[in-house]
Amino acid sequence: MTAEFLSLLCLGLCLGYEDEKKNEKPPKPSLHAWPSSVVEAESNVTLKCQAHSQNVTFVLRKVNDSGYKQEQSSAENEAEFPFTDLKPKDAGRYFCAYKTTASHEWSESSEHLQLVVTDKHDELEAPSMKTDTRTIFVAIFSCISILLLFLSVFIIYRCSQHSSSSEESTKRTSHSKLPEQEAAEADLSNMERVSLSTADPQGVTYAELSTSALSEAASDTTQEPPGSHEYAALKV
């Protein structure tokens, strides 16, 4: 009796464990794109969903699109979902999940993968826009440099004009002072002459002394020597 009870208890525990295991959700898978999640239009890309178990069924879904669904069974732990001739409408966020043969519950959803589909026309326009922006920047920089150069030349020219005008005014001032200096020197020489003439104690100038000396010499030559009368009396 006791043995039968124990066997039934063990059987119940095992069945309960199996049921619990079936209802347990598997861990979430991983989703990635190959060769890249950013692709050009009309090209191909493959989304790969990888699970933690083998012999599973995978499902691929798209965010904000409840009607999109792809299922795929695989004996491995990975499934591939190829996309060919991509269109802009294929862009969006994708996620995947899986379930094992022993479990009827889907696993947790994988992290969302953002698939970006670029337009070739936009890619062709992008370099031209970059080139235009660079050209505009170079043109603006050149204009600013030219303006600064002209401003520097103008400032240098104005400074040179100011210095030359200062030199000319200085020269004019010096030239205007020369006649005044000459007149002052002439007045000074006249004053010196007058002072010399007034400094003589007898009040006789150099010209008067010369005239009197000449007249005295002439009177001395006209007078006869004192011995001439005696020589005449003896001769008679």
From Swiss-Prot:
Q: Which residues form the signal peptide?
A: 1-16
What is any one GO biological process for this UniProt entry?
immune response-regulating signaling pathway
Segments carrying the region annotation (Disordered) are 166-200, 215-236
Gene Ontology MF terms in the entry: cytokine activity
Task: Describe the processing and modification events after translation.
Answer: Isoform 2 is N-glycosylated.
- Residue intervals of the Ig-like V-type domain: 27-114
What ranges does the Cytoplasmic topological domain annotation cover?
157-236
User: What positions belong to coiled-coil segments?
Assistant: none
- A Pfam family that this protein carries is Ig_2
Write down the SUPFAM superfamilies for this protein, in alphabetical order: Immunoglobulin
Q: Which domain of life is it from?
A: Eukaryota
The residue ranges for the Extracellular side of the membrane come to 17-135
Which PROSITE patterns does the annotation name?
A: IG_LIKE (PS50835)
Q: Which residues cross the membrane?
A: 136-156
Q: List the disulfide bonds.
A: C49-C96
Q: What is known of its domains?
A: Contains 2 copies of a cytoplasmic motif that is referred to as the immunoreceptor tyrosine-based inhibitor motif (ITIM). This motif is involved in modulation of cellular responses. The phosphorylated ITIM motif can bind the SH2 domain of several SH2-containing phosphatases. Both motives are required for full inhibition of FCER1A-mediated degranulation.
Q: What is this protein called?
A: V-set and transmembrane domain-containing protein 1
Species annotation: Homo sapiens (Human)
Lineage, opening ranks: Eukaryota, Metazoa, Chordata, Craniata, Vertebrata
